[in-house]
Amino acid sequence: MSQQQQGAEQAPDLNNELQTRREKLAALRENGIAFPNDFRRENISEDLHAKYDDKTQEELEALNIDVTVGGRMMTRRIMGKASFVTLQDMGGRIQLYVARDDLPEGIYNEQFKKWDLGDILGARGKLFKTKTGELSIHCTELRLLTKALRPLPDKFHGLADQETRYRQRYLDLIANEESRKTFQIRSQVLLALRSFMVSKGFMEVETPMMQVIPGGAAARPFITHHNALDIDMYLRIAPELYLKRLVVGGFERVFEINRNFRNEGVSPRHNPEFTMMELYMAYADYKDLIVLIEELFRTLTQNILGNTLVKYGEQEFDFGKPFAQMTMKEAICKYRPETNIADLDDMDKVVAIAESLGIEVEKGWGLGRVQCEIFEETAESHLIQPTFITEYPAEVSPLARRNDANPFITDRFEFFIGGREIGNGFSELNDAEDQAERFAEQVRQKDEGDDEAMFYDEDYVTALEHGMPPTAGLGIGIDRMIMLLTDSHTIRDVILFPAMRPQK
């Protein structure tokens, strides 16, 4: 049966069920308050299971524990004068035992039996163990708190349709325990990140989301218009330049966890709206960041997952040991063995290598840009184990400090896990004159048609002219980090409401 045929057959059933539920709601309205708000929940299923799952029925009977729970009715088995209900709340599920003779007269037959799966209930009663040993609540009070007008997505198989999972995340969270777990871990990671950063002496700050000049990354921005000021503004592509202004101002260790926006494509690794953590620390260089990153991942995995070994599909990452390190040119030669490392310093030869890989070398690209394109094509997807790639060319690193021994490269790295870039860090460029020259080069590239090239930010150059101490800066993609920690293989699985094309 095609999906169209199946949908056509299901539509009348759904319409009938919607009508039936609306009639039940109408009856509730006639009888009084249809959506009461005087019920107070005192217990969460997860806490009850943690505290009492190991108790015997005799122990529970002796303890005589009264509990009050609230949640969504997920299953119900009516067996004459008694029923079992599965109630789902924020912590998980717990079973209710509902007996006609233990409730006020008329509740069981005239109300409870007419309720539907998906309805939100409040229940009071005593904890006990069933004959099969399942912790349950013997209800002495049961109330309908919210009438669900639409049925649960699937009574038996959960919510499998990916499109629906993303468009109607609330259904996904109701139906799929794994999705709830993913976003619980996400919340824990954000909390742990903040705790880690504060423990290292960093101060959390907030910088503008709308900017007159977008900067801090090579990306196409979203444009909006400020009516009162009558100017175009940009949703930020990165907070970097504002955070470094704060370092100039004397806040020597700052970080921000917030959204960035890039007007680019959607893929399993990209969402136009995404979460980043950026940090800046004065009197440090990129090598200090490497140590910090290794400690950060070691701490997060141990504290949240209970183990520094993280499984991701068929792969396993060990965050308990130092990451591997390679230069960009070393990585190219490793994963394209026929490459002579000396050839990577010859423009004609790198262009030939690029073209042999199907890379269309654009006018205006210099040696460093072509090297970077070759690296992305040949090496990036092979960097499975945690790896730092160092010595990025200055041409593709307009905000990074040049290397003292070789000004063609910068004191910069990107780190990769599972074949994906997770973060980018470098010793910051604090030479105002060099920064002005690099901004001018970015403007030239933009004039030649590169819509990802940076704007010239005169105020930022002015800030550097006041003096910024030696500083190291880092950006980490939080969504990709969450993907690793939750074994999720598309970014949409770790963003509650990912960008979607509108339904027709």
From Swiss-Prot:
Uppermost EC category: ligase
CDD domains hit by this protein: LysRS_core (cd00775), LysRS_N (cd04322)
GO molecular function list: ATP binding; lysine-tRNA ligase activity; magnesium ion binding; tRNA binding
Residues holding Mg(2+) 2: E421
Protein location: Cytoplasm
The protein's required cofactors: Mg(2+)
HAMAP family linked: Lys_tRNA_synth_class2
Subunit structure: Homodimer.
Name this polypeptide is given: Lysine--tRNA ligase
Protein's organism: Photorhabdus laumondii subsp. laumondii (strain DSM 15139 / CIP 105565 / TT01)
Organism taxonomic ancestry: Bacteria, Pseudomonadati, Pseudomonadota, Gammaproteobacteria, Enterobacterales
Annotated gene: lysS
